[in-house]
Swiss-Prot record:
Mostly expressed in cotyledons, hypocotyls, leaves, and flowers (excluding pedicels), also present in roots and stems. This is High mobility group B protein 2. Belongs to the HMGB family. It comes from Arabidopsis thaliana. Transmembrane segments: none annotated.
């Protein structure tokens, strides 16, 4: 049996086949997020989760696992009928409408750009530095 490999040779060849991506080949840096941008609204399930967390904590005060709460909530959500989900869907829809209104106002504000009256801190300090230079002499003298 020429060319047959032993078990250890087979294992080592399988291990050597796996390749790791080169450094820097991953995702690029994410763009800086604007802290003033409105947050996206919660889905009906997450609105349900807000209520469910409170009741679950009361029933299971010793539970510290987030995964357990999430799993229990998911199971409960799946077991609910459409009529039982309706109030959560309505709340989510209401939040979505409010979000759309806020995002339109936010985008409109972005399109307008900064107002001319407002100056950035940097430009104000540059103006003050120029004023200071005009008031004093060109060269600073030591009083020693």
């Amino acid at each position: 049996m020429k060319g047959a490999k032993s078990k250890t040779e087979t294992r080592s060849s399988k291990l050597s086949v796996t390749k790791k991506p080169a450094k820097g080949a991953g995702r690029g840096k994410a763009a800086a997020k604007d802290p003033n941008k409105p947050k996206r609204p919660a889905s009906a399930f997450f609105v349900f989760m807000e209520d469910f967390r409170e009741t679950f904590k009361k029933e299971n005060p010793k539970n510290k696992s987030v995964a357990t709460v999430g799993k229990a909530a998911g199971d409960k959500w799946k077991s609910l009928s459409d009529s039982e989900k309706a109030p959560y869907v309505a709340k989510a829809e209401k939040r979505k409408v409010e979000y759309e209104k806020n995002i339109k106002a936010y985008n409109k504000k972005l399109e307008e750009g900064p107002k001319e009256d407002e100056e950035s801190d940097k430009s104000v300090s540059e103006v003050n530095d120029e004023d200071d230079a005009e008031d004093g002499s060109e060269e600073e003298e030591d009083d020693d």
